[in-house]
């Protein structure tokens, strides 16, 4: 990779960043000093908050305040391939979970780092942009858990309103000019048909067609080569409305109640200015699955013993606030290939890639590095098409110890290495974690314990995904590109399977035999020392379990901490109080099968309608 390419990359990125920052604050809705009273106060300008602020402010007679803790997002958040570059910066809460008991042994202090967006657009601005509506059974499960009115059939009108489709595979560019999808705010981009890794993955899946197997090509929230999430589709077009105020760099502290009716919101601006903003109608919490339960508990809504122990005034006892946390875990399985069809660092930083992106809105940078996903029962495999990656960036983001990272990603220093990763996951994990307070001060970090792999079901489910990956790689489409799986060798797992040692036994015996027989000929030396490609057998389940407990990491989908049916009712109203609703992923009673972001957009559309139709008392 030439110095010229690097220089051009840095220069273009720098200029783009300056331009983005210069014009980010031209909208009149951004304010620094709020008025004392609003009709609606929305906490959190994430995926749901952007939709709600846009829809509720459509009525010019109401005043809406959107409170966001973060500041404007940087330019890199707009480039689909560089989404992770925004993580662990000023626009990421970078939640550090508690040391895990059953997983994360390959991470420093067994501590997962969970990215959470901080700024307009929230996590939708730093995620991998992947679109999907889950599976119909996901919503039926919600109903069985007591969250009524949110089935797939209930949400279809809102998915159509937001996306113009109810399909998980879709391209907005194919919309007729007068079609429903052309009018929809959200835009989708389907991976190109000529993407070879996607085609190979799809062919292999078809070759091993089995019951309850579903393949989906990658679809992303992308428009004209740029990230296009709810901030772009909903909030940005509304930012010149006089009745909409957006307050950045402002943290919501707690809600004040009078006779169990929400009357105001305490806020902290720039970490120093405390203020109290009054509300006429409702406060809607859209702060995410960590911050929303934190605000509730600081407001006196949550487990009685915890609230009392922190000397917070108890408003209502609800043991479910902060419980039921669920997340997907991903186990990365590196596969090397011999055909140059994956995304590598050398390709990403080439001059041609930069020209493709900045002049044509196309190329490697214009789409997230995911080819597709295959579901089989409760397991799934995602094909992540990066053959090489930055060790420093990924290791810092995941919190891997250096040795573990280098063993898991063996070609981290080869910028031209061709390959990909299968991410093995369980789409309906049963392990449940918690979010709780350590102190009544917001300056003290909240305690987040995902409790990953606590349930044996999750282990068995992920093992099935790994076995599926093994079988897929034996199919002709993958064999033709020389696909070869790499099994890491973490020290903790060698007890269960030390394949390298077994493969080398024969070579060691031959060398010892030659030593006793005198000096070998040159030809004999060549025959002995010439490495042979080991035939690695399939590892035992015990090794796979050890491996996932060592290197599996968050899927970035934490949810469920204010579960529907437990903390909120079917109208998203917080139980036993009035004037407070919740609309974010914290209301999910159980996981959505993989990507939740598009689901949240549709749910927020319905939530806005529910709020608008609520009679004013």
State where each predicted segment sits.
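N-terminal redox-cofactor-binding region of secreted/periplasmic oxidoreductases
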Residues: 2-617
